[in-house]
């Protein structure tokens, strides 16, 4: 059975989708943008480092609502507006995800919603 996740402190989705869902032992966190807690139509201040920290914080909150932590993440997908930002993203990512690190995909995209620099989704197992 599938259940929707709506974590407190995570801004409402900017489209018709859940912040995340659970299906059995799996937890799926929807792509998170570095949006403001006060306004889901506005990005936080800062560059790629701050935006990466924000999306991981949001993912962490969604996972916590489902009883998971970042160490339960099995796979992530990062969407970057500029692949040249990957080194900065990797620095934040390495600090937040423990070994063994999740499997990961990185995709450069032509544009992200709200002109964000990064978006991330993940799959975790509880």
Feature roles, as predicted:
Residues 2-126:
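Short, polar/acidic, helix-capping and beta-turn segments at strand->helix junctions
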């Amino acid at each position: 059975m599938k259940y929707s996740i709506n974590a407190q402190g995570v801004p409402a989705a900017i489209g018709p989708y859940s912040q995340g869902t659970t299906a059995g032992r799996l937890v799926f966190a929807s792509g998170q943008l570095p949006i403001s807690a006060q306004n889901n139509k506005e990005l936080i201040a800062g560059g790629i480092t701050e935006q990466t920290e924000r999306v991981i914080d949001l993912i962490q909150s969604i996972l916590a609502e489902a009883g998971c932590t970042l160490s339960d993440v099995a796979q992530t997908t990062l969407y970057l507006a500029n692949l040249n930002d990957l080194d900065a993203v990797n620095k934040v990512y390495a600090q937040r995800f423990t070994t063994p690190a999740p499997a990961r995909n990185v995709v450069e995209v032509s544009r992200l919603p709200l002109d964000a620099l990064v978006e991330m989704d993940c799959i975790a197992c509880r």
